[in-house]
Each structure stands twice: as structure tokens, then as C-alpha cells.
Amino acid sequence: MVFSNGDCYRGGFEDDKLEGSGYLMLASGVIFKGEFHADSYSPVGKLLYPNGDIYYGQHKQFVKEGVGKMVYLDGSVYEGTWESDRKNLSGRMQYAESGDVYVGEFIDGKRSGRGRYYSTAEITIYDGEWSNDRRQGEGTILNENGEISSGEFRAD
């Protein structure tokens, strides 16, 4: 079924209404896979993006909102809280290329607030404050030799 706005639905119907499992292909190219009931879609489902990224979780009108997991085309994975399509509050990001992991707070999609970063290349752990994806404020680094360095970091 094709709608006047260009969206296209494939799935179950009951009494001429969207019902059961289905796919809604949005005019933007995003595909929602989930459950439908009486022409309404579930606030939890799978969103497939034209660039290959895949999101599983809560959404509001196909915008990531609430708790969810994003698997990026490059293999990186974010699991945590979303607000208005951005990583916000707390989550865990694993970077595919490096294998590094960040666990902590996010603001507007960037590491900001308190967080811990595990670096596989440097074999270090940074635990401290972040701002705009950079180490900023009080923090501690533990290196591969077990040495601990604490101090103030500035846009590092």
C-alpha cells in the first residue's frame, strides 16, 4: 500500500487497517520493521537506514527516543539512551575500527559528563570528565604497567 506522502506499507491488514507485523518504507528511505495495530505502529521496533545503519529500540515517529541499540555500517555499536535522534544521558559505545569502548554520559551525541574510556591500542583506561568528545576536567589514567596518573585534563 502506497500513501499520498510517498510512504509504502507491506504487511498485515485487518478491517482495512494496518495490523500485525509489517514494514513501513518512509519516503526518506528509512524502513521501519515492527508491529502495527489499528493503523498505529509500535513505539518499539527496528529502523533500517539507507546508509546501512540499523537501530533496534524505542522511537517516536521513527526518531530514536528512549532506550535502543544502533549498529553502524562500520561495525561500531552504541547501546543506551537516545533523545531526538542523538545519544543522550548514558550509554556504551564500542568503536569497530579500534575496538575501544566508552561507557558513560553523552550530551547531544557526544561524550560529555562522566565516563570511562578503554583504549585497546594504548592499553589504557581513562576514567574522568568529558566535554564535547574530549577529556576535559578531573580524570585518572591507568596504563598497561599499572601506573596511575591523575589530574586536570584540558580538551585532550
Where are these regions (language model features)?
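Short, charged helix-to-loop "capping" segments that act as catalytic/coupling loops
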Residues: 44, 90-99, 118-124
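Generic detector of low-complexity/intrinsically disordered segments
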Residues: 26-28, 49, 91
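Acidic/polar residues in short coil/turn loops that connect beta-strands
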Residues: 5, 28, 51, 74, ...
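Conserved anchor residues at repeat-unit boundaries in beta-strand-based tandem repeats, strongest
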Residues: 8-19, 31-42, 54-65, 77-88, ...
